[in-house]
Each structure stands twice: as structure tokens, then as C-alpha cells.
Design a protein with these regions (language model features):
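ADP-ribose/NAD+-binding catalytic cleft of ART/PARP-like enzymes
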Residues: 1-39, 52-55
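Short helix/loop capping segments that flank catalytic or ligand/cofactor-binding pockets
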Residues: 23, 48-50, 93-94
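Short active-site loop/helix that positions an aromatic residue
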Residues: 44-61
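Short, charged/polar surface micro-motifs in flexible loops or helix N-caps
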Residues: 18, 44-47, 88-91
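A generic structural motif
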Residues: 36-42, 112-115
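Active-site and NAD+-binding cores of ADP-ribose-processing enzymes
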Residues: 58-164
Length: 164
């Protein structure tokens, strides 16, 4: 895998399952579990594009941690949430993984790999955060941003009204 250092972001977005939310909030960090990094997107626009190429592609094959061949299950929006996070530490543990492709690949594949690589960044270690907003997945997939800070009322914005 080709890792390159990435600039330190001021905020990131993380897709997770709703049933993990309480543990995440109690810990105050996103844990990497069996992987080297935990993965994030730098904008909601990138998150949507990432999801369209991955979790929203039911049955599509991918390689999981350790090189195991897996297939995306049916995505259940009501069981997922996007977290908007402000990282606590400003250290440079951020990396981008550049999608590997065979030598002499067609230009279309090279371009697709480069575009996919720009959609996500990884953080080496468990990411501690200080602020969190929750973005409703079902609304997000309809093109709306329903966002709630902890202990604040929901705010709704249409995606075309936001600067992503």
C-alpha cells in the first residue's frame, strides 16, 4: 500500500453504526479496532462520494483488513450515522492511502483510483475528539443535512445550501 502524509484537518466526518455511538461518546475517541488506522472523510461531499463507491454498493467485492475478500452487505441507513468531529490533537498522524493498481493500467482506471484515494484519510491510532455533531443518515441520503450537537435541538439544511 502506498501511504502518504496528509495535512492535519480541522474537522472530519466518520461513518459508524448507531449502536456504537454511546461507546464512542463515552470514550471520546474513534477506535481503530483491527486496522492500523481509523478512516474519515474531510467533507460531506467526499463522504457521499465515498459511500456511493463502497457501502451503498450491495454485493460489491472489496478486500478487508488482512486481505480477506469480502462483499458489501445491504446498507441499512436507519442503523448508521455520520459523525462530524473536531480532532483534539494536532499531531501529524494523518495519512492518505493511494489505491494501488497494476502497472500499465488503462488511463480510466488510473484516474478512478486517484479520485477514490482523495475521498478518505486515515489517522494512525485512536482519534480523540472534542466536539461532535451527529448527522442523520436517512436525511443525508435524501440530500438534507439534519445535524444535532449533543444536547442541542436538530437543525436541518439542504445540501445545496451548504458549502461542502
Amino acid at each position: 500500500m502506498a501511504y502518504v502524509k496528509a495535512p492535519i484537518p480541522s474537522e472530519v466526518y466518520h461513518l459508524t453504526q448507531k449502536d456504537k455511538l454511546d461507546d464512542i461518546l463515552d470514550d471520546g475517541k474513534i477506535r481503530r479496532f483491527g486496522d492500523t488506522e481509523c478512516w474519515f472523510c474531510e467533507s460531506l461531499e467526499k463522504m457521499k462520494a465515498y459511500m456511493e463507491r463502497t457501502v451503498l454498493c450491495e454485493g460489491k467485492a472489496y478486500y478487508g483488513v488482512g486481505g480477506q475478500l469480502c462483499h458489501y452487505p445491504k446498507f441499512e441507513p436507519d442503523k448508521h450515522i455520520i459523525l462530524k468531529l473536531t480532532p483534539c490533537r494536532r499531531e501529524g498522524n494523518w495519512y492518505r492511502w493511494n489505491q494501488e493498481i497494476p502497472l500499465n493500467s488503462p488511463p480510466e482506471l488510473v484516474q478512478a483510483a486517484a479520485e477514490f484515494s482523495k475521498l478518505k484519510i486515515g489517522y494512525r491510532g485512536d482519534l480523540a475528539f472534542k466536539d461532535v455533531e451527529m448527522i442523520d443518515m436517512e436525511a443525508f441520503l435524501r440530500g438534507e443535512i439534519v445535524c444535532r450537537r449533543m444536547q442541542e435541538p436538530e437543525q436541518t439544511t439542504h445540501m445545496d445550501e451548504m458549502t461542502l
